């Protein structure tokens, strides 16, 4: 998988470590992801990924910013009209420019895969397959990796731990550049 995306409503709390060791418990994990929803892999073209990124802003003034895995970087401009906010030249996947004609493997939760929060572009994904539960992926990620770091910054994400959660969705499925 090249990219994982999570809707902000899928993260219900910060995943803050209990102490300096970085330990977290199941209750905290459950607070972060109470739904226990399925994870879906799919194939999207680069053009479809750009379309999904643009769907973060609506003509009615609402927005729902996606939480991407660390493999995706892009800039957007709120001063641009809806449908033209993503700076397409800035979009990088694994540090390389996104190729609109190329196919990419993407993982999202089942809510997004079914056009949740108005992200209709995910319904166009090809080769969709359900492969596990989001909470279990987070537990596997936390069990296999280093302790949860304390947040250092916040930006587009609800918290820096939202990025950890998006990466956890794709644990074992992200390809290397």
Q: Where are the model-predicted features located?
A:
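Catalytic centers of hydrolytic enzymes
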Residues: 1-177
């Amino acid at each position: 998988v090249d990219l994982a995306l999570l809707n902000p409503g899928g993260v219900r709390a910060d995943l803050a470590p209990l102490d300096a060791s970085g330990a977290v418990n199941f209750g905290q994990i459950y607070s972060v992801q109470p739904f226990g929803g399925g994870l879906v892999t799919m194939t999207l073209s680069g053009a479809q990924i750009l379309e999904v990124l643009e769907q973060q802003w609506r003509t009615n003034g609402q927005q729902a910013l996606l939480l991407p895995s660390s493999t995706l970087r892009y800039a957007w401009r709120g001063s641009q009209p809806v449908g033209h906010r993503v700076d397409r030249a800035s979009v990088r996947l694994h540090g390389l420019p996104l190729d609109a004609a190329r196919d990419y493997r993407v993982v999202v939760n089942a809510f997004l895969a079914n056009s949740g929060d108005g992200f209709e572009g995910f319904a166009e994904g090809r080769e969709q397959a359900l492969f596990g539960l989001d909470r279990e992926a987070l537990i596997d990620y936390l069990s296999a990796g280093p302790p949860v770091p304390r947040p250092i910054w916040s930006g587009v994400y609800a918290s820096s731990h939202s990025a950890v959660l998006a990466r956890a969705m794709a644990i074992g499925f992200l390809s290397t550049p």
